Amino acid sequence: MTNIKHLAIIMDGNARWAATHNLPKSEGHRAGADKVHELLPEFINLKIPYITLYTFSSENWQRSNTEISFLMRLLNIYLKKELDNLHKNGIKIKVIGRLNLLSDSLQKQINNAIELTKDNNKLTLCIAFSYGSRQEITDACTKIIASGKTEILESDIQNALYDPEMPDVDLLIRPGGVFRISNFLLWQAAYAELYFSQKYWPDFNKEDIINAIDDYSKRKRTFGKR
C-alpha cells in the first residue's frame, strides 16, 4: 500500500537492452511490452490508482519507418491480446497523444479499448502514445483560443489537456540510465519526485518498483513551501 496517486514511467532502454543481447530493436520493444504485463499485477497490489506509461513520443516519429511500423503494430497487438484481461481486472484504459496521426485501424482499436473499460475503477492505465507534453499544452491553448476565451486561467489549461481528470504526478520513474524527462507530462509533473535507474526497462522488476517507492516515501515534499 502506498500514498502515490499517480505513478508515471518513461519506459526507456528497450533498444539498448536488445543490443546487449545481440537482438534486433524490435525484440527490445517486445520485451518492454511484456514487462508491462508482468508488472501490472504489482501496481494493482500496491493500490496505485493511476499509472501513465510513456510508450511512443512525438519525437519518436523521427525514427526509421521500420521501427515506427513495428511500434504501431505492437500497440495494436498488445491491446488485442491484453484487453480482456485488463477489463477482467478492473483496469480502465486511457490513451493520450496526437492520436489523429495514427492509422484508422489503430485508432479504432484504441477507441474500442477505451469504450470497453470506461467504467472500470480499480486502476487507470494511461498510455502516452504519439505524445509530447509541449504539443499537449499547445493543443490545449489552441482549443481554448478556439472557444473564444481572451483570458486564460490555469484551470482552463487543465481542463483542455488530453485527460483533464489526470491527477498530478507524484512519482516519475525513468529506467535506462538517462537523466531527463524528455517532454513527458511537463504540466502534470510540475512537483513530481523523480527517480532514475541504470537498469533498462525490460530488466526492471517488482523489487525495482518497490525500491523506487521506498525512496519516494523517505522524501519530504514541500511543493515550494518551507
From Swiss-Prot:
Its job: Catalyzes the condensation of isopentenyl diphosphate (IPP) with allylic pyrophosphates generating different type of terpenoids.
The name this protein goes by in its record: Isoprenyl transferase
InterPro entries: UPP_synth-like, UPP_synth-like_CS, UPP_synth-like_sf
A Pfam family of this chain: Prenyltransf
Keywords carried by this UniProt record: Magnesium, Metal-binding, Transferase
Cofactor detail note: Binds 2 magnesium ions per subunit.
Cofactors, names only: Mg(2+)
